[in-house]
């Protein structure tokens, strides 16, 4: 057979086996199915076609065994080709964007130049207006300076001379003598007003100087009063001794002089009240004048109240001599007035004047007026005034005043922290340390709470537990149960846990257990060793609580520490006969 004949027979297509045919059909179905599933058209996205045919390539390579290496190399070239196309496409997109940017640069430059011209024109307008305004300001200043230097001439000026002169009839205005007389009257009135301006009005600085001078004089008065009391006491003692000596000399001098003095002194004590009454009823001109001044002061105060000048009346009452109007009765007078539309509350004006002048008197404002003043200020939403009163003025605080401030803080949540700070000051001044510490806890000032507790010697464990019930904070409990400055903890951790779980505060107790659980067994052991208040039975209860609430590891740690501590026996130094190895030989 020739070569030509062999080539003729080789032209026939190869016979495909059944398995290959089924494989080709499955591949064809896979391509059609995936194309329809992805919604690819004939001109669809190349990435999705690439994924489909890459998977087909993988299936063909897995199916064919004879040409696997050739097909693998073809697939690699195919992947490299597709990757090159993608890279070129990204490069084209980036270059296209840069080209657009370069093409838009001339237009942007034109817009920027145009905007620069507009802004420069606006700046020129603003500078021009500023220079005009500055020139006007300089002109006004110059005119004001000239006006201040010149003497002001007061002269009557009538825009319409045809109108009648006020206070004169038409016939009198035409009479020269009447006009001369009226002009003399106006000149006298002008001189009187000018003199009144010099006498009745003083600069504000003069008032400040007088206030300082008044404070100095009040201090001198207090010193003089104290000295006067001491001298009166010395005079009374000398008078008793003098009377006793004269009586003892007149007597037979049989009894000792010291016993005689004591007997006369007792007689003086029994007759003391009568002496005081006689002293008050003594006809002293100075005291009569003082009573007259006080009576006039009260009448003037009532007159101001009737005229509706409540601000002046408040200042008048606050500066009353011997504090005769600084009392509850005066407060009730202002309270009865009530609110006036468009004007400040008269009662608030009274308390402002009362508290501001508290430093001018030797005794502070009493507790009742302090409480009413704080209530009045808070009812008018004037927390700023109350803050100034509490921190700056001389007041007498009470527990009720602190409670009122705390209640206001609960209503006004925005100013709650400020109210708690003010209440803490009030409670501290009153010696109510428990409430003061509670205010600090509510503010979150844990370190100040610890310092406060350390300063108090009579703060017991029950007080601490009550504090935790009022303000259950994890940070506070941790500070109370830790050593501070090498001192024992203020509170037992075990007792705190038991108290929290018994008082339906399970959430706080669980948070506390979570924090302790983070420290591991070393932290638990240190906590238990330093806790000298909690017994073994109590710690066993704590372990049971841990186990019931899902803290099994913490429960096991506590139990193991308890067992290890139970196995330890302390040997005293005096017991020298103890044989430590005795159990080995027995």
UniProtKB/Swiss-Prot annotation:
Gene source species: Homo sapiens (Human)
Protein name, entry field: Clathrin heavy chain linker domain-containing protein 1
SUPFAM superfamilies reported in the protein's UniProt record: ARM repeat
Keyword Coiled coil: yes
Listed InterPro entries: ARM-type_fold, Clathrin_H-chain_linker, CLHC1, TSNAXIP1_N
Coiled-coil intervals, chain numbering: 174-232
Pfam families tied to this protein: Clathrin_H_link, TSNAXIP1_N
Domain of life: Eukaryota
Keywords: Coiled coil
